[in-house]
């Protein structure tokens, strides 16, 4: 069974809205789009290329699919490894309104999310990677369908904007399985779910020692 890996670009204060371009997502009056672009360098590109080569398919919400579809099909340089993989990989788009996805190969998922994701995880090789797709990502987290988090944390504070980990998600322990830092200061943390969250307290012993 393949793993579902959630890949997210986020600021230090957890904002994931509109990372790649000013007009990517202006919902809620957000006007700071494109905040990750100054930090893209050879090392971040190398990270992205390495991980996209591990993908067997890409799972996206409709808006993220349409945003990516407006750019990547037009990158036809045969030496661009990232574009080559993104364009050839199967895309699975969760949507109840999209009927004819133009960026192929693509399949629209309109049925029960948990059922469809379990089927996709049981069928095929390589990671099933989620990129962006804020609403979809929250649904996957809430239903316990994420096997690994790949969180790209950029050295910026935005102070406003949509966050991935909002109120209402189930408390969950995480285990760090990897961490990398780019030359530009981007830190990529990789976590896997570690079961229910546990709690404790600090108490001094009879001799006053912690």
Predicted regions and their residues:
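Portal/gating segments that form or line small-molecule/metal binding sites
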Residues: 1-145, 155-210
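A short helix-turn-beta junction within AAA+ P-loop NTPase domains corresponding to the substrate/partner-engaging
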Residues: 148
């Amino acid at each position: 069974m393949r793993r579902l890996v959630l890949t997210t670009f986020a600021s230090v204060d957890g904002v994931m809205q509109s990372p790649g371009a000013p007009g990517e997502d202006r919902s809620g009056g957000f006007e700071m789009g494109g905040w990750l672009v100054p930090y893209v360098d050879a090392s971040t590109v190398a990270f992205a290329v390495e991980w996209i080569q591990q993908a067997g398919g890409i799972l996206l919400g409709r808006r993220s699919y349409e945003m990516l579809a407006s750019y990547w099909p037009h990158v036809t340089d045969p030496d661009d490894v990232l574009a080559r993989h993104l364009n050839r990989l199967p895309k699975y788009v969760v949507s109840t309104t999209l009927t004819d996805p133009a960026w192929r190969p693509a399949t629209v998922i309109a049925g029960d999310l948990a059922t469809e994701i379990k089927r996709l995880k049981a069928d095929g090789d390589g990671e099933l990677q989620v990129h962006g797709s804020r609403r979809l990502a929250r649904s996957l987290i809430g239903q316990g369908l994420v096997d690994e988090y790949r969180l790209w944390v950029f050295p910026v504070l935005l102070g406003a904007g949509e966050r991935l980990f909002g109120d209402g998600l189930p408390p969950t322990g995480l285990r760090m399985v990897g961490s990398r830092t780019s030359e530009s200061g981007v830190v990529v943390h990789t976590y896997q779910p570690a079961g229910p969250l546990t709690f404790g307290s600090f108490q001094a012993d009879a001799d006053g020692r912690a």
